[in-house]
Amino acid sequence: MQTFKKLILILLLLALFVFSNGQYTFNVLNKAPGSKCENGTMAELNTCSKDCLTSFLILKSIDKKSLTFTTFNNNQCNGDYNTQTTFDCKPTPQNISQTQYFISCEEQTSKPTSSPIHSNSTIKSTSTTTTSTPLPHKDTPHHSASSSSIVVRLTPIFFIAFASLIFLFGF
């Protein structure tokens, strides 16, 4: 009976990790005057890939307190997607510009209306702090294109998992 109880708890713990990888909503980290946010993590979005992208997502600040994903369509594969960055996607080798935003995340209950980020997006659990405005762009090698990453804070998930492990092996 004790083994069965531990097996059930392990399955519940596994389900916790599986279902915690859901949709997220993002809040701006903005230490500028008037900001109400203090903590955040970093998201990097690559705007170009080996083949020209005709649509992509970018984080956009609406009320200086929150960020939302906005989908931009660009059939000509060149143009201005925000006030500080222009891109020119070409099928030939080139350097890729990156835009960095610093955000924190909380799981949201409803799915966003915009399309998801590229299928090869990765989620990491590192955090840092800075302003929410885009930083100066760095050129990255062409081979690192076609990947976007969103860095989210997973501390609450790991705390629940740790507590579950203590409960699991403590009884």
Curated annotation (Swiss-Prot):
Gene Ontology CC annotation, any one: membrane
Biased composition (Polar residues): 109-118
Chain intervals for the UniProt region annotation (Disordered): 109-145
Record key words, sorted: Cell membrane, Glycoprotein, GPI-anchor, Lipoprotein, Membrane, Signal
Residues listed as glycosylation sites in the UniProt record: 39, 95, 120
Low complexity biased stretches: 119-133
Protein name, UniProt field: Ponticulin-like protein E
